[in-house]
Amino acid sequence: MGSEMCIRDRGYLTVMLVHVKPSLNRVIKMKDGKIYLRIGDHSNQLTVDEAIRLEYARGVRSFEEQIVEDATFDDLDPETLTLYGEKMNTEVSTIRDLLCARGAIRVKDGVERITCAGILLFGKMPTQFIPCARVRFLRYDGTHEGVGGMINIVKDEVVELPLPRLLLRMKDILASQMREFQTLDEDGTFKKHPEYPEFAWLEGLVNAVTHRDYSISGEYIRIKMFDDRIEFLSPGKLPNIVTVENIRTTRYSRNPVIARVLSDFGWVKELNEGVKRIYIDMENFFLEPPVYSEPGNNVQLVLKNNIAMRSMRRLEEIINRI
């Protein structure tokens, strides 16, 4: 639009103000092929690797669809394939057709090629081809992360399995660390109350595994459990149009192939109800709302329990008995 403004001693001049909205679903290239990214008040030229990562982030390029050059069907895990066939009521002899339909296998020049999604979902050892495809669980004694001589890790487990089996193993690990509290009800019976609603922490795990940016090498999913909270740290920023502010209502899958297959396994609902229900379940347990943030190049979810309040009430009960 045009408007007039005074330019020092030159009087009023007509200038044109042009507002260009950022492109969220494509990457703009110059005529010479160079790509620039606006950061603050500077336009930075991207390297080839940075440009590829931007294409992944914008959905222009999909990491899960890339071919894993050295992988063959023999690198896939028979146990996971059999389980998938049972879930889909498919004979083992036709499992290849199903994997092709889902995008785990691509046929190129008449040759079967395994995709990154195929390796992540069904690989015998996914980290052989994608080293970052693992989850590390850390249990700390206390509410802070000690270092050096003050290190306070009491449990440290790393899981490297095809994603459906990885989720099952991680669910067992997390469940084994959850506390139960007993309270005396009005009818004189003791009632057990879990530390966190199961759906909330399980959805945090599933989302971290399903939606992380697997193109980022050298980073892996970390789940840290303290006395007062659980932290889920997943590599990569929130994808495309999703922000910390609209995450409850906006759905966008960075890895639609992985999401679809994990939905077939029963892990993902694909109805955009997961994050909403985390908020609802935490509220129903009288716990603080979940906290989403983007520290560094990661997405973090923090679930807080009410151990401090429970300790305070316990202390009050002891004092009252004295």
Protein language model annotation of sequence segments:
Residues 199, 203, 230, 256, ...:
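Feature representing long, continuous alpha-helical segments
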Residues 38-217, 225, 233-251, 274:
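Active-site helix-to-loop segments that bind/position phosphate- or nucleotide-bearing substrates
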Residues 16-19, 119-121, 136, 222-224, ...:
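Structured core elements
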Residues 10, 140, 187-200, 222-229, ...:
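A glycine-rich phosphate-binding loop feature that marks nucleotide/adenosyl-phosphate handling sites
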Residues 8-72, 216-219, 269-272, 280, ...:
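Intrinsically disordered, low-complexity regulatory tails
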Residues 175, 179, 209-214, 237, ...:
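Hydrophobic alpha-helix feature that most strongly marks membrane-spanning transmembrane helices
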Residues 2-7:
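Short, small-residue-biased leader/transition segments that mark boundaries at the very start
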Residues 230-264, 309-319:
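Glycine-rich/acidic phosphate-handling loop/turn and adjacent ATP-lid/helix
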